[in-house]
């Protein structure tokens, strides 16, 4: 057997990475498959550890080229950051790689390493991350300017690093500030996809249809437009967009290759943004679709969308390829399942399906948002247990850690049931500024109705209620329509309009199949017929009311 000469031996040793790099990637690929199929388990850990050992073996080669060492260290750090929290090890490995990049003037490699280092600092030292990324943005901008002047033949567009670093600052900087920085830079350099990304981040998309060749970007734009509508309470406009999303999802040509969405700077360079997998997307669309119909109790769509969403959460399959993303995905699925349950409870309560709402309430764990406290209060209020409902509303309203929306809703509900008129008036005064300046105009309408109810049955105030009825219809809020119609009917007394308002409320309740509001509006109509001595209609309505009363006497304690 012929031995190797000195030159051959040197080539064999220094080429160690040519064998070990692909071998390591094979182990990593198999580890990812195990993660997707079985989650975090022993076999996953063994495969990951063996792959890392392959890369560490490359670093033991004393004669390897600097670029080989740099790339090996970079890959080790990518794997560690994806699957572990070994931040100290990653920082040490990266610092050595950065020295190599500086020594050999490998600027783009240096940028990629700094991006990884910023991820470490965001977890260990946010202040250091801010200092690092601020400097990196400035250096990347200077690098891009020089590259443009000298027409450098880079593999990637030099502007890419500016965007990468700006996006990394989202860890500690306001989204609006980052979006504005991206938009200004993209606008100056005419990067249309990145301008679009900035508008998505800032939730400032126009309501027109966005033309794009990417199914992923198209869906993301539609979801963002719906989010913009919901933020302002423009429910009907959000519903107009929903069919476009469902149509795209059902299309045979629909493509969703991964959790990452590509925004192109030019024909070859792109920024990949992590959003969600196709399985997560379907759940999100079911949640949004259900939410768009919650306020309209005349439609059963909200419960159908939310029930279907909850059904498929049981069959959810993770598609993440790293442990930290897998854990984030698990947290996400838990949160969206909880949100679906909450909104389904709200849907059942809006249609007076108390037994269904109660079953879900009993199986739902509390959270830190205060929403469950409001739902419990609403349930007790529907049951007629106003004292206990008041306790839930007060506890939720006085917790300053909750969102403004939560505070407003709990306070409005509290005002609605308070027996102490002076306390109710004080609550109205305190919450009025918040309702008036809030983006969701529906809060202002609720405030107006409660003020009118609390200020007494003067006829001259009734002109507020017709306006509320019209606007509540535009916002597709059935509960607000019920209250406004019945209150207005009682204010009209013996006038013909009183009958019309009560009949409208009753028809709305029948369409919603809401026995409680059928009974409430039916009793108002019965009292009206009695007051104007229409005894035949009164007796007919009394029989109908008796039937509704029997339907719900096991549920409502005050009937």
From Swiss-Prot:
Belongs to the SCC4/mau-2 family. This is MAU2 chromatid cohesion factor homolog. Interacts with mis4 and rad21. Involved in sister chromatid cohesion. Forms a complex with mis4, which is required for the association of the cohesin complex with chromosomes. One of its GO terms (cellular component) is cytosol. Transmembrane segments: none annotated. One of its GO terms (biological process) is chromosome segregation. The gene is ssl3. InterPro entries: MAU2. It is found in: Nucleus. Keywords: Cell cycle, Cell division, Chromosome partition, Mitosis, Nucleus. It comes from Schizosaccharomyces pombe (strain 972 / ATCC 24843) (Fission yeast). Its main location: nucleus. One of its GO terms (molecular function) is cohesin loader activity.
């Amino acid at each position: 057997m012929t031995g190797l000469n000195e030159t051959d031996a040197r080539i064999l040793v220094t080429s160690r990475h040519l064998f070990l790099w692909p071998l390591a990637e094979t182990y990593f690929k198999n580890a990812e498959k195990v993660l997707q199929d079985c989650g975090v388990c022993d076999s996953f850990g063994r495969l990951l550890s063996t792959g890392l050992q392959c890369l560490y073996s490359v670093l033991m080669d004393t004669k390897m080229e600097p670029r080989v060492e740099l790339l090996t260290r970079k890959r080790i750090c990518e794997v560690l950051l994806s699957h572990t929290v070994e931040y100290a090890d990653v920082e040490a490995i990266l610092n050595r790689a950065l020295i190599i990049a500086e020594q050999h003037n490998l600027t783009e490699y240096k940028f990629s390493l700094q991006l990884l280092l910023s991820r470490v600092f965001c977890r260990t030292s946010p202040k250091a991350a801010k200092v690092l990324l601020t400097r990196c943005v400035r250096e990347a901008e200077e690098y891009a300017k020089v590259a443009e002047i000298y027409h450098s033949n880079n593999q990637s567009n030099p502007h890419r690093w500016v965007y990468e670093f700006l996006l990394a600052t989202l860890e500690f900087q306001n989204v609006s500030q980052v979006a504005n920085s991206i938009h200004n830079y993209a606008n100056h350099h005419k990067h249309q996809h990145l301008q679009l990304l900035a508008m998505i981040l800032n939730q400032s998309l126009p309501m027109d249809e966005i033309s794009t060749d990417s199914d992923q970007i198209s869906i993301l734009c539609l979801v963002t437009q719906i989010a913009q509508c919901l933020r302002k309470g423009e429910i009907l406009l959000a519903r107009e967009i929903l069919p476009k999303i469902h149509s795209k999802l059902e299309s045979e040509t629909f493509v969703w290759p991964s959790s990452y969405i590509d925004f192109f700077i030019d024909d070859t360079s792109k920024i990949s943004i992590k959003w969600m997998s196709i399985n997560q997307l379907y759940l999100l669309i079911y949640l949004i679709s259900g939410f768009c119909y919650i306020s309209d109790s005349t439609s059963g769509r909200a419960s159908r969308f939310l029930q279907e969403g909850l059904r498929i959460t049981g069959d959810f399959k993770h598609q993440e390829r790293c442990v930290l993303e897998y854990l984030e995905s698990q947290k996400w699925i838990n949160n969206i399942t909880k949100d679906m349950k909450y909104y389904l409870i709200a849907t059942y309560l809006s249609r007076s399906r108390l037994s269904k709402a109660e079953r879900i309430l009993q199986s739902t764990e509390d959270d830190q948002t205060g929403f469950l406290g409001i739902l419990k209060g609403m349930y007790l209020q529907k049951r007629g247990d106003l004292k206990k409902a008041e306790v839930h509303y007060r506890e939720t309203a006085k917790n300053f850690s909750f969102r403004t929306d939560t505070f407003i809703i709990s306070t409005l509900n509290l005002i609605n049931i308070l027996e102490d008129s002076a306390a109710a008036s004080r609550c109205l005064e305190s919450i009025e500024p918040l309702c008036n300046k809030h983006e969701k105009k529906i809060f202002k309408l609720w405030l107006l109705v409660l003020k009118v109810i609390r200020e007494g049955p003067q006829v001259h105030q009734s002109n507020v209620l017709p306006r509320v009825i019209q606007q509540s219809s535009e916002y597709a809020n059935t509960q607000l329509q019920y209250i406004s119609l019945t209150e207005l009917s009682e204010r009209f007394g013996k006038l013909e309009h009183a009958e019309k308002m009560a009949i409208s409320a009753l028809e709305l309740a029948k369409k919603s199949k809401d026995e409680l509001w059928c009974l409430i509006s039916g009793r108002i109509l019965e009292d009206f017929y009695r007051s104007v001595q229409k005894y035949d209609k009164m007796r007919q309505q009394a029989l109908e009311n008796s039937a509704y009363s029997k339907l719900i006497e096991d549920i409502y304690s005050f009937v």
